[in-house]
Each structure stands twice: as structure tokens, then as C-alpha cells.
């Protein structure tokens, strides 16, 4: 096929020249040829998980919430959980759009980031839907990060990892800048989505396991399914940047990352104590000390760092829940079937 060569200097993309960051040799607008098959697989898996909160019936949750069958301590856990997640998902989405996307120079990785940003919006929608369904004070829930010290501390911690990256003069071309960018990725993928969120999932899914607040529980299952992919993408992205830029992975940077995770563990334990001043549903705040440390070790190992806590997992059932390859179909209880563009009725 004949082609009009508009610019003789521009050539078709060579896969070997693609890079995750600082790649100016290829056109970032050309998806193919795909180099990072893991990024494309994460994108496809994300697309296979399409869902909306409004597809989940909330009648049983509404009935239970309006009754006197839930204790005040159980209500406290639910409200503080919603209070954290309702704005945390927005922080993650904003970080993708404003801090991460522009520094990633690979189109298939960007393709997934666009998908993830959409999912974060769906998750934020979820917490609004829950508030509206239960008749909660939306201002109280969505402003909890300004009113609850344990939530504010976690969000402030996350924002410290975004400030430098949002500076208009920030660049990942230097080792210092790239190291700061990696810390941002660790902060949001490893810590926020891989530690803070998982602790929250345990709390709400514990209700679901006892047939309480099942509508909320089902939505959290969907979110967990999304977040598992987010976490895996983030780990692959961090490891990919390390592999392509080995000079940035210094002992100093590794120590800084370990210190960040240690601080995150402390913050999450304090949050768990705030949520659970007394035990409910077989949960005690002391169990979250072990759990948060356990998953922190797993996250450290996934990015090539040594575990530091060696704690047991007090919630082994979460391993099954997190397994994306399990036979259970999370979407079998949906009110409506998801329709792709190809079969919508006009």
C-alpha cells in the first residue's frame, strides 16, 4: 500500500525501543507493537470486570441498617470504613491522572492507567450509592478524612508522596527524580491499594461472611477484584522501571521504601484500633497488627525487598477471596447483565 510520507524522520515503532519512562524514541500514541504484554493483560482483565454499583441490590442492607440488629460497634466499623474509602479512591484516581500518567512513556501501560482511572471513579460512585441507599449523612462520610484523625493521618501520609511529583518542574530524567517517582508508585500501589485497602476489605467482608450487609459486601468483592489487578499492575510497573533503570535502585532508595512501608503499617494499625475499640464478628484490632504486617511483608517481597515482620496471617480466608482464578463467579448475582457496545439496543 502506498503511503504519503509526511515526515521522513518519523519511522514505524520498533518494539525494542519502547520504554516505560524517559522514552522519546518512539511515538507514545502508537499502541502496537506491544512490548509489555503484562500491561496489556492487566488491561484486558480489567475490561472483563465491568460492573456498576447500581447493579447490586441493597434492600437487605437497608432493612438491616434500619433495624436494631446491628450493634453500635458494628455500625462504627462500617461508617469509618466508608469514611476512609470514599475519598481514598479519589486520591488514587487523581494521582493516576495528575502525577503518574504523564511520566509513563509506554502506550500499553498508559492504556491500563486509563482503565484504572475509570475504575477508581466507579469505586467512588460505589460509596455514594451506599450512602444514598442507607440514608447516611453523605457529608459526614465523605468529609471523614477532615474529621477523623486516624483517616486524616493516612491521607496526609499519601499526599506527601504526591507533592513533589505534582511540581511543574518535576522530571524523572534524573536518578533523584525517578527515585521519587518510584516512591510515589510504592505509596499508591503498594501502600494505599496493597495495604490500607486490604485491611478495610477484611472488615467489610467479615460482615459479608456472616450474611450481614451483603449488598455492601458484594460491592467490596468487586472492588477487591479490581484492586488486585491494580496492585499487580503497580508491582509489574515498579519492577519494570527498576529493570530498565538499575542505577536508580540504590540501597538508599530501598531503605527509604522500607521506612515508608513501616510508617504505613503503624498508621493502619492505629486506624484499626479506631475502628475496633472492642471486638465484633470475631475481629479484634490486635488481629490487624498481624495481618497488616503479614501483607506488608508480601508486598516487600514482590518488589524484591526482604520481609521485616514475619507475622502470621490471621485471615487465611482472604487468600481465597483474592484469588482471581477461583471458580466462583462474582458477577453471577448481578441484577442486570452487562452489555457491551456491540449488543446495546438503540
Curated annotation (Swiss-Prot):
It catalyses: a 2'-deoxyribonucleoside 5'-diphosphate + [thioredoxin]-disulfide + H2O = a ribonucleoside 5'-diphosphate + [thioredoxin]-dithiol. The active site is at 129. Binds 2 iron ions per subunit. The keyword Chloroplast does not apply. Fe cation 2 binds at residues 120, 193, 227, 230. Transmembrane segments: none annotated. GO terms for molecular function: metal ion binding; ribonucleoside-diphosphate reductase activity, thioredoxin disulfide as acceptor. Its cofactor is Fe cation. Fe cation 1 binds at residues 89, 120, 123. Provides the precursors necessary for DNA synthesis. Catalyzes the biosynthesis of deoxyribonucleotides from the corresponding ribonucleotides. Tetramer of two alpha and two beta subunits. This is Ribonucleoside-diphosphate reductase subunit beta. It comes from Chlamydia pneumoniae. The gene is nrdB.
